[in-house]
């Protein structure tokens, strides 16, 4: 559709409100291909389903193989000039759901609701990207900042393989839009995310017979109990600092003083300064029981996504464009991490642009069609925006 001017927000919204059937078609084609993170062999089919849609839109698609994951997909405009600024749409096509989930949790359309494994987190976000790009083509709009897309297959297990690609791309981007689900049924955008640290505490004690000579032993379990109390004392809920000992293991038999014990700890913070301070506190814990020793390993695999000046700027842009669409957008802090935590270290990042719905990682996972089409309209307008100052 040729136009002499850029379409108004109302034109874009009206067009996308007519794309309900296309949204359902695209989403069903992806959800029916199950793609659990821990089954890399399942990822190739879903990647091809998605790649075909981008190629149909004229994008050059690069399939990046993975060693321990199902690989990645990078799509870009072939006519992008060397050195020209780009904007990245970021997402993942892996899900937490095991093979066979569709047998008892099928893809289902019920009025304005779509249910199924991965519809909300986050195959619906990939559909939004496609709908937004289709909309730009429909109105014959050429964005001044070239759009690119990166999708990985290991986000749900920490992006250990794809993280370096994401960092390398983010450095060269004017901005990044993360198509993870929005926050809550009111659809808040995620302008901050907590950083996530993972630490493993290993205690070594001395085995002894629990009845004949307990004094000759040094209980690794007793020592671990002291460490756990020290760890929980680091919680500061007012600041949003959470320290959780999620798993513990140890001992040989009931009648043996435990020579070994171990705990795995999840830590979440809102700022880089808090991450550094709490890391130092955890690593400085000393054993309290004579005859025991401690080894604590760990780090923050996802740094906090903070409300930096660049992130505030892109939020203000989204808020203004949302108002043009008649949307009253709100922002929020997410307790979980995403690949947006990584890109935020390098460039302006706006997260939670994906579907409006509920039930990520839960059996009631669903999205709202009408609200998700509105988010596709918002993404369309963001893609057309000028380069950030």
Q: Which residues does each PLM region occupy?
A:
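Metal-dependent amide/peptide-bond hydrolase catalytic core
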Residues: 2-11, 65, 97, 181-186, ...
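Acidic/His- and Gly-rich active-site-bordering loop/insert found
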Residues: 2-117, 138, 142-143, 340
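Short glycine-aspartate micro-motif
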Residues: 86-88, 114, 174-178, 200, ...
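Short beta-strand segments
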Residues: 90-91, 150-152, 177-180, 202-204, ...
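Glycine/serine-rich anion-binding loops at beta->alpha junctions
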Residues: 97, 113-127, 209
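Acidic/histidine-rich catalytic neighborhood of metal-dependent amide-processing enzymes
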Residues: 122-192, 236, 387
């Amino acid at each position: 559709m040729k136009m002499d001017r850029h379409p108004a927000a109302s034109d874009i919204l009206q067009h996308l409100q007519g794309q309900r059937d296309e949204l359902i078609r695209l989403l069903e084609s992806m959800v029916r291909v199950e793609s659990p993170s821990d089954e890399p062999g399942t990822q190739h089919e879903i990647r091809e389903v998605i790649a075909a849609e981008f190629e149909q839109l004229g994008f050059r698609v690069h399939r990046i193989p993975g060693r321990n994951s199902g690989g990645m997909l990078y799509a870009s405009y072939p006519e992008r000039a060397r050195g020209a600024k780009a904007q990245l749409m970021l997402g993942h096509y892996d899900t937490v759901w095991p093979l066979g989930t569709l047998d008892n949790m099928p893809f289902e359309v019920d009025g304005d609701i779509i249910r199924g494994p991965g519809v909300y987190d986050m195959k619906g976000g990939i559909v939004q990207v496609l709908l937004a790009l289709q909309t730009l083509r429909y109105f014959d709009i050429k964005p001044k900042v070239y759009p690119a897309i990166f999708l990985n297959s290991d986000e749900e297990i920490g992006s250990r393989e794809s993280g370096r690609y994401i960092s390398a791309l983010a450095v060269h981007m004017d901005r990044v839009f993360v198509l993870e689900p929005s926050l809550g049924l009111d659809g808040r955008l995620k302008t901050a995310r907590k950083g996530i640290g993972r630490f493993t505490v290993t205690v070594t004690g001395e085995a002894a017979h629990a009845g004949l000579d307990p004094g000759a032993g040094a209980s690794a379990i007793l020592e671990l109990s002291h460490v756990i109390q020290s760890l929980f004392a680091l919680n500061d809920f007012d600041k949003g600092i959470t320290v959780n000992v999620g798993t513990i293991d140890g001992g040989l038999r009931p009648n043996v003083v435990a020579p070994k014990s171990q705990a795995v700890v999840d830590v979440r913070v809102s700022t880089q300064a808090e991450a550094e301070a709490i890391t130092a506190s955890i690593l400085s814990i000393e054993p309290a029981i004579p005859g025991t020793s401690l080894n604590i390993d760990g780090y923050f695999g996802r740094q906090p996504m903070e409300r930096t000046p660049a992130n505030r700027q892109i939020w203000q842009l989204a808020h203004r464009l949302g108002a043009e669409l008649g949307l009253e957008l709100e922002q929020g802090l997410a307790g979980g991490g995403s690949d947006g935590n990584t890109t935020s270290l390098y460039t302006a990042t706006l997260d939670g642009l994906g579907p409006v719905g509920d039930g990520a990682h839960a059996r009631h996972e669903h999205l709202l069609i009408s609200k998700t089409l509105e988010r596709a309209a918002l993404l369309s307008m963001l893609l057309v925006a000028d380069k950030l100052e």
